[in-house]
Design a protein with these regions (language model features):
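Conserved beta-strand-loop surface patch within small alpha/beta domains used
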Residues: 1-75, 83-136
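Conserved, mostly hydrophobic/aromatic
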Residues: 78
């Protein structure tokens, strides 16, 4: 997946600001291009396990989808952080995956972003396959 440096920087900053909790958001790009040029933060509605779980607030998802449509943008995928864990998909992440989207995970170690990886699923619930991350 191609992502603008500014978009990746925003994801990393969001992860650092949200530490030690998981943060989440949506990645957008010009319709049909499959590249990420902008991101939108979303609320994590899993409060009781925010340290190791996330779920995007459905109201944020709808609002961001409407915004993307108005801009003639696609939702390219979703991002979230793993506080003090590697940027690798958990079983929980994989089970909740939808095909057709890219999932970016950023590792935040002691409040600082250290790594990011992308994954795609061929069908609902995975399995996840690695997707190259190209910062351009």
């Amino acid at each position: 997946m191609k992502i603008a440096q500014s978009a990746l920087g925003e994801i990393q900053a969001h992860g650092a600001e949200g530490y030690p909790h998981e943060i989440c958001g949506i990645m957008l790009g010009p319709r049909g291009e499959g590249r990420v040029t902008e991101v939108r933060r979303a609320r994590n509605i899993i409060v009781e396990r925010a340290r190791d779980r996330y779920e995007i607030d459905p109201r944020d998802h709808i609002r961001i989808q409407k915004e993307a449509d108005a801009m003639d943008y696609d939702i390219v995928g979703y991002y979230h952080s793993h506080p003090d864990h590697p940027a690798q998909a958990s079983r929980f992440d994989t089970e909740r995956a939808w095909p057709g989207y890219v999932y970016l995970i950023v590792s935040i170690q002691e409040g600082k972003p250290v790594d990011a990886n992308c994954f795609v699923a061929d069908k609902d619930g995975g399995p996840f396959n690695p997707e190259p991350l190209v910062v351009a």
